Amino acid sequence: MIGRLRGILAYKQPPWLVIDVGGVGYELEAPMSTFYDLPDVGRDVILFTHYAQKEDSVSLYGFLREGERRLFRDVQKVTGIGAKIALAVLSGVSVDEFARLITSGDITALTRIPGIGKKTAERMVVELRDRAADFSSGAPITGQLGPDAVSEATVALQQLGYKPAEAARMARDAGAEGDEVATVIRKALQAALR
């Protein structure tokens, strides 16, 4: 329903933040991994979102990186895990670290994440191992000029068929402070042809 929001960061106090989009304040819940990289209040921000509706509530979750949102959704597909534990996972470890823990089957490290016991960790390893390679943190989406161009170029490169991690690396390597999105994309594609 709501896949992405771009607006002014009006409020941030973990785990809640508010983004003003055209005069409407969207309240979102976000993991600490998102809070670490948020710009200051009053600055532009772009967040990937996940909309969840239950019988008695509607929730909106925000993530700076597409890989975080993807992981949030995949973790909730594991039997017995909901949004609260999925947020705890993203607040406790990076997407890349989580993928490593799942791939290696490190049950002990997974149980250090709040809300995850041994049986849940074992279920996570079994149910997510095949998808762990697809997890990628990607580049953060922010409203600042340089990073914004790099982030938007990352999304564009993904739409051209590049994997999220590869697209993020290409855009980051090609981008310079103040570059336009088209410039970053052009430089990234030229570098890929060399």
Curated annotation (Swiss-Prot):
It is found in: Cytoplasm. GO terms for biological process: DNA recombination; DNA repair. CDD domains: UBA_RuvA_C. InterPro entries: DNA_helicase_Holl-junc_RuvA_I, Hlx-hairpin-Hlx_DNA-bd_motif, NA-bd_OB-fold, RuvA, RuvA_2-like, RuvA_C, RuvA_C_sf. One of its GO terms (cellular component) is Holliday junction helicase complex. SUPFAM superfamilies: DNA helicase RuvA subunit, C-terminal domain, Nucleic acid-binding proteins, RuvA domain 2-like. Residues 65-140 are annotated as: Domain II. Pfam families: HHH_5, RuvA_C, RuvA_N. This is Holliday junction branch migration complex subunit RuvA. It comes from Xanthomonas axonopodis pv. citri (strain 306). The gene is ruvA.
